[in-house]
Amino acid sequence: MSKIAFVGAGSMAEAMISGITSRSNQSPNQITVMNRSNDERLSILNTTYGVKTTHDYDVLLKDASIVFLAMKPKDVFSALSTIKSFLHEGMLIVSVVAGVSMDSIETIINKKVAIIRSMPNTSATIGKSATAIAQNRFVTNEQLQVVTTLLETIGQVTLVQENQLDAVTGLSGSGPAYIYYLVEAMEQSAEKIGLDKEAAKALILQTIIGAAEMLQNSTKTPQTLRKEVTSPGGTTEAGIHVLQSHQVQEAFINCIVEATAQSKRLGEKLSQEIQTKSLMI
């Protein structure tokens, strides 16, 4: 059984801790968590999940085989600079920090350590994340399998190349917000056409869940499934024509492309900042 350390104790760290402790054979007493100063937060994690907590880096990292980086991007340089003396080549670092490349992590710690970079989404909190991971050249097949198994406790895991993670961020990382935005519009339209709020909510949610399961279980393409619901001269066709007149499909494409571009811009900025700070040491 791996000894796991979490550097950072925010919502994503908690989602992973919840998944790992409830959906794997990992013992909570083999998980240690720390943050910079929030004792109340650590107390909640200890009480809720039975994990150990500390403010001592030696206690956190002694004998740890997997180190999860779960701090905010702006704190990565200072956190890694502080813990790098405790890191060694037998460890595996798993980063869930958005925008921070594996090269940047290697630059800060200046050691040949196995690194896996992960991009989950907020559905991790209910064990339904669409998570993409990328690995550096030092990761073994065994390490990859262990981390994949751990991350599968918060959802589905897909292995990609690191240069695809900006696209993953734009598509599935931000993806839940796009669906929530769609639901907002459906709720507003339900009110406009006179549907009861609670009834509308139930209908909307089940419609989305049902459509998602159809996509997951059917061999048919989304286009085929859509056309099967769209009878000539019918209600669905009338609605689709309005969406097409407003170029909704094109807007969604542009939305994801721009989110991807922004992820790349933010990542490049972070990399430059880390490089500059590293040169100053």
Tell where the protein language model's regions lie, with residue ranges:
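Hydrophobic packing residues within well-ordered alpha-helices of enzyme cores
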Residues: 16, 20, 42-45, 79-83, ...
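NAD(P)-dependent Rossmann-like dehydrogenase/reductase catalytic/cofactor-binding core
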Residues: 205, 209-281
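Internal alpha-helical scaffold of NAD(P)-dependent oxidoreductase catalytic cores
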Residues: 104, 108-114, 130-167, 180-217
